[in-house]
Amino acid sequence: WQKFVQKNRDKKKIVAVDEAWTFIKYKESAEFLETLARRGRKHRACLLIGSQFIDEFLSSEQGRAVINSADTSILMRQNPAVVDQVVEYFHLAGGARDLLSTFQPGEAILSLNRNVTGIRVEPIPYEWEYIKT
């Protein structure tokens, strides 16, 4: 951690972690993500988390700390088994429950500094080449 943040102190750093649920399951990597989430801004470091399993984050202290440290959250379609937990944790209105269960690709709830709105992202034609899976 110290070596990472002290190197090139004047440069912004982005740490992107996809499938982050695999890291939050293990004590050492979960603690690193928590430290980065809590202290990164002070050291010009940004943590970008992607995960299909939000319940892994909500069920651990470190995972909740990572979520709580984020200024921005994007909630896409959720597994129906965890929708109630997500709505409660993020203090969403009751209507969000149905949305989170039925969102289509590109639809999400955006929470920015605790301001919440629904969004739809529609790529322009040339972007499709880069995002098709």
Explain the meaning of each model-derived region.
Residues 1-9, 100-133:
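Conserved P-loop NTPase motor module
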